[in-house]
């Protein structure tokens, strides 16, 4: 169980009524949330919800389509209903880049939730410890496969990150290569085979640095 919606960040509000809509009760201060065995979702909230449905065969059960997957509640009318993550292999994430390292991990960068490092593609991965938001570019050094580079973010939270220990720790490069105090973000990255030189083509510029 983790902290109630909105879990320290933005999230939608949920209401129930038992009198045809004359009165509504806000659930956000009462409900609990569970990651459903998917650890990476435990810092997230239900948000951008596009649809809700009550099970016609079990009116205690509700399913919600969130911006990050599906949440289900089996006890919606209880005093403290519990929503749990119910997406098995269909998380609502957007991969921007995926690299399979020969003999190593499957590494990805995705929208909103940074990305994953997976030892087994059939199992849930571990979110990058940087937790840097939306990442758009990823590269792995061909002869130094513990060295990875990624980029992403926006003007408010730009990001160019690198790791030399296969994602155990990440370093954020604060320097922006652009002139006139313009902040670089997004785009694509590259890394030399030996992992000594990084390349960045920011999404808001036409050059490679």
Q: Where are each of the predicted segments found?
A:
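Conserved core beta-strand positions within WD40 beta-propeller blades
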Residues: 61, 105, 146-147, 197
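Residue-level marker for isolated small/hydroxyl-bearing positions within beta-strands
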Residues: 2-6, 64-65, 109, 150-151, ...
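Long hydrophobic segments that form regular secondary structure
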Residues: 44-71, 160, 166, 186-199, ...
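Low-complexity, Gly/Pro
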Residues: 1, 142, 171, 193-198
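Long, non-globular targeting/processing and low-complexity regions
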Residues: 148, 172-176, 198-201
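Short coil-to-beta transitions that initiate beta-strands within beta-rich domains
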Residues: 7-9, 33-56, 82-102, 127-145, ...
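Ligand-binding grooves and catalytic loops that recognize ribose/phosphate and carbohydrate rings
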Residues: 140, 148-157
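Asp-box/BNR beta-propeller loop motif
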Residues: 8-39, 60, 67-93, 111-129, ...
């Amino acid at each position: 169980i983790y902290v109630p919606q909105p879990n320290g960040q933005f999230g939608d509000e949920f209401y129930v009524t038992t009198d045809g809509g004359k009165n509504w009760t806000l659930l956000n201060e009462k409900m609990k949330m569970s990651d459903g065995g998917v650890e990476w979702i435990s810092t997230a909230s239900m948000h951008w919800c596009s649809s809700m449905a009550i099970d016609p065969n079990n009116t205690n059960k509700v399913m919600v389509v969130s911006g990050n997957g599906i949440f289900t509640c089996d006890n919606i009318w209880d005093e403290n209903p519990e929503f749990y993550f119910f997406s098995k292999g269909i998380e609502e994430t957007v991969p921007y880049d995926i690299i399979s390292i020969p003999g190593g991990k499957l590494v990805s960068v995705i929208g909103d939730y940074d990305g994953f490092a997976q030892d087994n593609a059939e199992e849930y991965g571990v979110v990058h410890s940087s937790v840097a938001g939306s990442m758009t570019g990823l590269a792995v050094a061909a002869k130094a496969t513990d060295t990875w580079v990624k980029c992403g973010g926006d003007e408010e939270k730009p990001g160019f990150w690198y790791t030399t220990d296969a994602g155990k720790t990440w370093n954020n490069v604060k320097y922006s290569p652009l002139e006139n105090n313009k902040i670089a973000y997004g785009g694509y990255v590259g890394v030399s085979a030996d992992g000594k030189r990084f390349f960045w083509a920011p999404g808001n510029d036409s050059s490679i640095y």
